Regions:
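Copper-binding active sites and cupredoxin-like electron-transfer domains
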Residues: 7-349
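C-terminal motif of bacterial Sec signal peptides marking the signal peptidase cleavage site
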Residues: 3-5
Length: 349
């Protein structure tokens, strides 16, 4: 096994170390088997995306995801607490504060090349995780594409320009993803959040609860696993360019769940909640997250709808004052019909 590392980091800073692997899994976009928004079985129109047939994959797909382990043996998965159940297929939350350092011990358990490329934090060319003709060579290229079975250590720092700005709340969200054929990699599932706080450690002391939501139309036609999914879940597909087949593999999800199947969105009245929003995708990924029954503060402005473009990142705050179960969804009409809907529940104190 090849183990490589990028340049050394300061001994004076607090270093946050994460053991993260890229793993292949089977993912169910609707594990309850029904539309939780309506409380009924999927309709004919909804079954376009979730029903299995001789020539349709359905709601379960082979994907690649980032998963956190307890140490560099990568033998034991680190348990994900109930407060992060809602992350779905997103990778683990990477946290740090301004002035801290981040160390990612990354193992590629896939059969294809992968990397870890961060947004927002400071990295040198030997820790960028992105292959392109940038004029570098030698050690500066080792981070770009990690071979199957190999391990690489990425080291990033968090200067002031990576943390919250003057109009931001006390913590903000960035993201990380594989940049080896980035569209195919992110459609396959290789993406996760980075949370940076003004305070060292990456935790914000002025909030009670945090949620991360990715809004994206995952194009399962453009992943590493289309042929493998066809082989495993269908009896064969004659024409993968067929419009109906193509449409059936466009999964309009939030954290990899459709039609209200996103779990774990539970909080208590009176709590201060911070929402970290991530947009990703292509030209159809123009999203408008909307919360029912509550409002949020974004850069000092109050609203209940935001706009998300592909690769955009937004952090908003909500003070809970309205008990009940509330819709949280993209307000684009086509995305509503295709299942980009979830719910959050506000319990009594």
């Amino acid at each position: 096994m090849l183990i490589a590392s990028c340049s050394s980091i300061s001994n004076k800073a607090t270093t946050h170390t994460y053991y993260i692997a890229a793993d292949e899994i089977q993912w169910d976009y609707a594990p309850t088997g029904k539309n939780q928004i309506t409380g009924r079985a999927f309709s004919e129109d909804e079954n376009v995306f979730v029903a299995t047939a001789d020539d349709r994959i359905g709601k379960v797909y082979i994907k690649s995801v980032y998963r956190e382990y307890t140490d560099d043996t990568f033998s034991t998965l680190k348990p994900r607490g109930p407060e992060w159940e809602h992350l779905g297929y997103l990778g683990p939350v990477i946290r740090a504060g301004v002035g801290d350092e981040i160390k990612i011990v990354f193992k590629n358990n896939l059969s294809i090349m992968a990397s870890v490329h961060p947004h927002g934090v400071f990295y040198t060319k030997d820790a960028e995780g992105s292959p392109y003709n940038d004029g570098t060579s030698g050690a500066d290229k080792k981070d770009n594409m990690i071979h199957p079975g190999d391990t690489f250590v990425y080291e990033w720092s968090v200067p002031e320009r990576s943390g919250p700005g003057p109009n931001d709340p006390s913590s903000i969200v960035w993201m990380y993803h594989s940049h080896v054929d980035s569209p195919k990699a992110t459609n396959s599932g290789l993406i996760g959040p980075i949370i940076i706080s003004r305070e060292s450690g990456g935790y914000a002391s002025d909030v009670d609860r945090e949620f991360v939501t990715l809004f994206t139309v995952t194009d399962e036609n453009d992943t590493y696993y289309l042929d493998k999914n066809i082989q495993k879940f269908t009896k064969g597909v004659d024409d993968t360019d067929d419009d109906d087949f193509y449409e059936s593999n466009l999964m309009h999800g939030m954290n990899g769940y459709v039609y209200g199947n996103l779990p774990g969105m539970v909080m208590k009245n009176g709590e201060r909640v911070r929402w970290y929003l991530i947009g990703l995708g292509t030209e159809i990924d123009l999203h408008t997250p909307h919360w029912h029954g509550h409002t949020v503060l974004f850069n000092g402005n109050r609203t209940d709808v935001l706009e998300l473009m592909p690769a955009s990142l937004k952090t908003v705050d909500m003070t809970l004052d309205n008990e009940g179960t509330w819709l949280y969804h993209c307000h684009v009409n086509d995305h509503i019909k295709a299942g980009m809907l979830s719910m959050f529940t506000v319990l009594p104190k």
